[in-house]
Amino acid sequence: MTNGTPGVPGGEPPHPSAEMLASATKGFDYLFANDIVGSREHFNSKDDPFHLMGAGVIAFLEAALGMETNQVTEASRCLALSETGTRKQMKAPKAKTHSRFPAGLEWDIINADAVVLLGLTHALSETYMGYLQCMYSLNNAHSKFTKLYKTVFPAGIDAEEKPPAPAEVAPSSSSTLQVPNGLQHKSSFSSLSSVSSTGSNATLPPAPPSPTQPAVTKSFFSRWLGSSAAAAASEPTLPLHHHQHHHIPDGPVEELIVSGTAFGYGLFNLVFSLLPKKVQSLVGFLGFQHDRKLALKALALSASKKDVHGVFAGLVLMTYHGVVLLLSGWQADEARIINQYKGIIDNVEERYPEGALWILNRAKILRMSCDAEGAIRVLQNGLKPERPHSFAQADMMLLFELAWTLLGQRRYQESADSFMKITELNTWSHATYYFLSAGCHFALGNLEKTQELLDAIPGLIHNKKVGGKDLPTEVFIKKKLAFYKEKQKRRCGDEAKFAEAIRINPAEELGIFWNTHARVSKEICKSHVADVLHLTPALTITSPTITALSSNSNSNPTLPTPASATAAMSSLSLSSKSSTASKTSPPSLSKSKSPLDLDTPDELAVRSLLLGICHRTLEEFDAARKFLLDAHGYQGQVKVNTWVGGVAMFELAVLELKEVEFLEKGGGKVDWMKAMKVADERLDVALSLSPNSVDLSSRLDSRISMLRDEMGIKREMLGGKA
């Protein structure tokens, strides 16, 4: 859906769908500028499939971003009407058009969009029937986008000639959105996944001309139902349409067709490629294939267009780059990712400077570039009450990012307030936000508030389940609360005040899953080390940072007391033994009759894991390796924190790569292939330690997949075998 007049450049009569498309585009302009009220009013003013789709998108975003169940019904209603309307248009007689594409192809695009969103809306119901309907819809849409891809890009995406820009639309100034060269389309969708995800150029021949539609890979549903899908079976077959030497400049409808096809096809490939391996095996059985490199090319092509699909493609790419930068742990070419990320944002933000989603991603770039304070300023400005328009669900995402960034900066009071404010904006897992806020108050030494928040959590945990299971973070939280209570009981304390038994900040512990400690300053990392340095039993691993912190503590007894020591409520002495302690044995606490702070393997494992991550950020790699190996060493002894072993091995894999990168920057001789071999072995162990029974195992599974992809890119850069 493209900005501009509906007519076709060059004096040709307007496309039959151009007027509806131009009007619907205006509604999306309101949405992207945060004016959700104006957008809804505009879409509700007409009942054609384009406008019904727009109304459905608004309701879907409200339902998905805010987990607002009352919007699910409205989204389903609008999207179902749009799907029905486009299906009628697909079967209706087609007027003659001056276009390089078959007449009416735009309706196939909108129909496929409606089917995808309708399927995802079914999934929001969190019922077994909803999930079944979702899989059915996705299978249907998968077939549709496969056919569209073959029609719109018969020789592959790279063979798509960049058409002359319509007179009313200026070409994109972002060079980062140009589609790379080198990939040729193969003759079937199933073969696309065999294109090397690491090779820079494929030499496969283009698909030969054919008067009929090539066979689509049979899926589980097609075998089960006897056709690819009931709805798809009633569609007219899309012919292969060769248009390699078109001379008619593209108008808005042509941009919709190109951008929409590339977006839908790329989105499917990318989403399936990011699923945990265990889930990929299931969707592979269902017939879904994926090729991440092709997905990114398709999305980049879509994002380079001015059509509405291009904006959504840009948003998908921003989200992908943000996730890789945050969770993969290491990137083969971080500067390239950040530059591409910036280019996409610049392209969209120029058109919609007030849009919350672009503000969010601008802040993420700053955070990933280690400018957390800059990110905080951007987010706070984006949340100012004097803004002309606001989109509550998008604001929630800004607030979520702000809360995590403040937590990473140890601005605990502001972070606690932000997490609690999120509970006013959406209904998703208030227990998680209370737990994080409680951790912030623990860090501030406010045990009374910590206890108050933790006491409220059992009443907040939803009975509603996802896929028949509790929310992963809530499973984690329930285990932690039981652990704290058991520890307090074991120590003969008042069980109603179990917060007294906490020694390691709950928010920082949960933050390990969000990789909070990887992109913070060295000073902040030193503060994290100081928080757990004096906990008993004494550390048996030392480092330059530990030695320096211990020495400072001895020479300056007026230093602030760590929150963990405040929580101890005991007569522990924070003064260390003589500063002449051995380099291989860090200074320890004075002997005391008080119970140990950390009296279980679970706590000792988490302390070592946190120290390992922080020392890696401090570039003290030897100590980091020792701490991470120590954390993994408790694997057979932990009872609650069974996730630590797998995460520790993942962090060790990241360490192997970061250490070589650090040495290379310093001019040292390095062996990347050896380092990646060791990292691969670490990841194998990590994967073996994260079965479904382990907390947040799917998150670790996805992180492992992303890191391996980055290693594949590095091998390509080195000219080695993937």
Curated annotation (Swiss-Prot):
Principal subcellular localization: cytoplasm
Gene Ontology annotations for the cellular component aspect, listed alphabetically: cytosol; mitochondrial outer membrane; nucleus
Pfam families linked to this entry: Iml2-TPR_39
Annotated keywords: Cytoplasm, Nucleus, Phosphoprotein
Matches recorded under SUPFAM superfamilies: TPR-like
InterPro entries per record: Iml2/TPR_39, TPR-like_helical_dom_sf
Biased composition (Low complexity): 187-204, 576-595
Highest taxon above the source species: Eukaryota
Region Disordered, residue ranges: 186-215, 576-597
Family: Belongs to the IML2 family.
Stated name of the protein: Inclusion body clearance protein IML2
Annotated organism of origin: Coprinopsis cinerea (strain Okayama-7 / 130 / ATCC MYA-4618 / FGSC 9003) (Inky cap fungus)
Gene name in the database record: IML2
